[in-house]
UniProtKB/Swiss-Prot annotation:
Protein's gene: sdhE
Record-stated family: Belongs to the SdhE FAD assembly factor family.
Biological process according to GO: succinate metabolic process
Keyword Chaperone set for record: yes
Protein name: FAD assembly factor SdhE
Keyword Repeat belongs to the record: no
Cysteines engaged in disulfide bonds, as pairs: none
Amino acid sequence: MELMNIARVRWACRRGMLELDVLFQPFVDNVYQDLSDEDKVLFIRLLECEDPELFAWFMGHEVCPDPELARMVVQVRGRAAP
């Protein structure tokens, strides 16, 4: 998967759940540009997941079955706030 420009990433972060918006928007604004290209691709992969899955992973109700995506979930949760 190729890297998206920042405007497209911001748009992809707009979800159907406010809880996810609150996590993703600050992460993109404050952290995304500093990620390695590999992690940017991984974040984009994460954004392709369905909202109910993302919500369950970020709220700790379920563990993401993909270890790479699980690492990105931890990274977003830990660094989303400024």
